[in-house]
Design a protein with these regions (language model features):
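Conserved ABC ATPase signature
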Residues: 28-32, 36
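A short, proline-enriched helix->beta-strand linker immediately N-terminal to the Walker B motif
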Residues: 47-51
Length: 137
């Protein structure tokens, strides 16, 4: 959105700092860990100033330490009031950052509502079974 190279660098660094990798502003993707690559992707998306962000399994291929770095960024974005649509099997993440959860089964809405109602008192048998299997893992 800026025309000069210097202004563009400032803009890029602003968003890289926001996601915790400002020191990597000049690194190549191959020089970044999986979590850093994921956060760089979030910074790129934020540069577009979107009205909503879409995350598709943002932590699924990350080891636990890197996963926590990405989760922190997503939680910070939620605290800012950003609109996010997150496709995830991570029920803790969904419970922590959502104000509305939609549980899908075979591509159809099985149940939806607040995180509190869905996770504490699921109505559908399929959601009950899913939650009990994720709690046991």
């Amino acid at each position: 959105r800026t025309s000069s190279s210097a202004a563009s660098d400032v803009y890029k660094r602003q968003y890289l700092n926001k996601v915790g990798i400002g020191e990597k502003w000049n690194a190549f993707p191959s020089e970044l860990s999986g979590g850093q690559q994921q956060r760089a992707a979030i910074a790129r998306a934020l540069c577009m100033e979107p009205s909503a962000l879409l995350f598709d399994e943002p932590t699924s291929a990350l080891d636990p330490e890197l996963e926590q770095e990405v989760i922190k960024v997503i939680k910070d974005l939620a605290l800012e009031g950003r609109t996010m649509i997150i496709v995830t099997h991570d029920m803790k993440l969904a419970a922590d950052v959502s104000n509305h959860v939609v549980f899908l089964h075979q591509g159809l809405i099985e149940e939806e509502g607040s995180p509190n109602s869905l996770f504490k008192s699921p109505k559908s048998e399929r959601l009950q079974k899913f939650l009990s299997s994720t709690r046991a893992a």
